[in-house]
Amino acid sequence: MDITVREHDFKHGFIKSNSTFDGLNIDNSKNKKKIQKGFQILYVLLFCSVMCGLFYYVYENVWLQRDNEMNEILKNSEHLTIGFKVENAHDRILKTIKTHKLKNYIKESVNFLNSGLTKTNYLGSSNDNIELVDFQNIMFYGDAEVGDNQQPFTFILDTGSANLWVPSVKCTTAGCLTKHLYDSSKSRTYEKDGTKVEMNYVSGTVSGFFSKDLVTVGNLSLPYKFIEVIDTNGFEPTYTASTFDGILGLGWKDLSIGSVDPIVVELKNQNKIENALFTFYLPVHDKHTGFLTIGGIEERFYEGPLTYEKLNHDLYWQITLDAHVGNIMLEKANCIVDSGTSAITVPTDFLNKMLQNLDVIKVPFLPFYVTLCNNSKLPTFEFTSENGKYTLEPEYYLQHIEDVGPGLCMLNIIGLDFPVPTFILGDPFMRKYFTVFDYDNHSVGIALAKKNL
């Protein structure tokens, strides 16, 4: 009998009804169907077993290991330390590149670059723009609770604002439908205020009213004045598209609406912590997690000296540094250390001079530049003061975009102008350096972050 198995019998995964099994000497068609069905079931079971094994391997060796590492760090901390998740702008940028069919343009531009054409040969002009997307934004997500019944919320940890707000059960706008909502009627520690308020951000506006209740961060709780948000329409599409519920401001009191002390300062005022400071540690090997410590400094997060730079303004975490890139220099520039920025922003004129002869290509319609990851012409940033010197090598400001093209990287550097020449030292800087935000001494501490704990 012919039991030859032909490859095309399996082209759809399961055995075809008119396959070579018809060559078997089986008179009963029902028995033949049972055998075929048995093979199909066996195939499905085998496939499911392989997939379950793969899932278990990933869970055991990646996710579980990451959770265990984070829990070990939190357990051994001397001060209140909480883990947080990082949502980078990288995925949103790539989505936009694909949505607007820019992938081929970028590849073609890189071909121009490889052919020896100058950087001015790119597709798209310097004035092109895609609106309504804050590409420079990065979000640090941390968890906290509100009310004596500890209603859970996920917050953006934002050094560029100073109020805490949560969406209220009284919110009727569409953005609130998928969020955790604060219900004051379920908390015995709620105190009514009712003062109406509106919060303005770069991404939009939210409005609501002040309330007071117990706020818990980690194992610390305190009565705190915050905003119940009832209208998020002005904050769209950012709010609906993201996974956070509210914002926990870590800026200065002068930034706050209603002259509310930042929560870290209020923790010290109520003798919950010894020092009014917080720190950020972002592991280099894990782009999606970080650690916020409140009230003290965990020395195991950094190595070498911890250098402090005095603030030049009690509004943002803004210090004065001299900026050098090659022979380009800007003395006494404002430098804002910011947890809400995924890039290094530099004055436009400074950026244009820096990019000359670097073999980079502008991404059409977007404020970004692409280059080959092994581009040896890329420079090192140097920020200096009387107290210290802080460098940022290409490996820290390059973002690999292999899914656009092999060997391609994007520069996490954006041109941005302020009335006074200003640099924003965002995620690339904060991944290389452990940072301390010290309210008591009006300063920012900077030390080399440990690559491995």
Curated annotation (Swiss-Prot):
Residues 1-37 are cytoplasmic. Residues 59-453 are lumenal. Not N-glycosylated. It catalyses: Hydrolysis of the bonds linking certain hydrophobic residues in hemoglobin or globin. Also cleaves small molecules substrates such as Ala-Leu-Glu-Arg-Thr-Phe-|-Phe(NO2)-Ser-Phe-Pro-Thr. It is found in: Membrane; Vacuole lumen; Vacuole membrane. Its EC number is 3.4.23.39. It is a single-pass type II membrane protein. The keyword Cell division does not apply. The active site is at residues 158, 338. GO terms for biological process: acquisition of nutrients from host; proteolysis. Pfam families: Asp. The keyword Acetylation does not apply. PROSITE patterns: ASP_PROTEASE, PEPTIDASE_A1. The chain crosses the membrane at residues 38-58. Disulfide bonds join 171-176, 373-409. Residues 140-447 form the Peptidase A1 domain. Residues 1-124 form a propeptide. Keywords: Aspartyl protease, Disulfide bond, Hydrolase, Membrane, Protease, Signal-anchor, Transmembrane, Transmembrane helix, Vacuole, Zymogen. Coiled coil: none annotated. Inhibited by pepstatin A. Belongs to the peptidase A1 family. Component of the hemozoin formation complex (HFC) composed of falcipains FP2A and/or FP2B, plasmepsins PMII, PMIII/HAP and PMIV, heme detoxifying protein HDP and falcilysin FLN. The HFC complex is involved in hemoglobin degradation and detoxification of heme in the food vacuole during the asexual blood stage. During the asexual blood stage, participates in initial cleavage of native host hemoglobin (Hb) resulting in Hb denaturation. May cleave preferentially denatured hemoglobin that has been cleaved by PMI. Digestion of host Hb is an essential step which provides the parasite with amino acids for protein synthesis, and regulates osmolarity. This is Plasmepsin II. It comes from Plasmodium falciparum (isolate HB3). The gene is PMII.
